[in-house]
Amino acid sequence: MSLLPAVKVLPLGYLGIVLVFSLILRSAMVDFIQDAGKLERIDTYKREAQMIFGAPMWALGHLMGRK
């Protein structure tokens, strides 16, 4: 004697898993979009520093923050 037949429960479980998975992906996607904006600013700074200081790429970390 079951309360709900398995035919009605299985699609609800599948729908629940899909919804939870989509929420997890959406939250991760927002983090990656924000991080991409930060990386773009860092790359811009490296290009500007290379033009200003004329330093090779390996030396930019040493020159960052100095004026």
Swiss-Prot record:
- List of residues that carry Pyrrolidone carboxylic acid: Q50
Tell me where in this chain the PTM Methionine amide is found: M64
Tell me where it resides.
Secreted
Entry keyword Secreted:
yes
Principal subcellular localisation of the protein: secreted
| Tissue and organ distribution | Expressed by the skin dorsal glands.
Q: Which residues form the signal peptide?
A: 1-30
Q: Where are the transmembrane segments?
A: none
The record, for InterPro entries, names:
Bombesin
Q: Name one Pfam family in it.
A: Bombesin
Transmembrane in keyword set: no
Q: Which GO terms describe its cellular component?
A: extracellular region
Q: Which residues form the propeptide?
A: 31-49
Q: Which UniProt keywords apply?
A: Amidation, Amphibian defense peptide, Cleavage on pair of basic residues, Pyrrolidone carboxylic acid, Secreted, Signal
Q: Name one GO biological process term.
A: neuropeptide signaling pathway
Record's family? Belongs to the bombesin/neuromedin-B/ranatensin family.
- Tell me the function of this protein: Stimulates smooth muscle contraction in isolated rat stomach strip.
This one is known as Bombesin
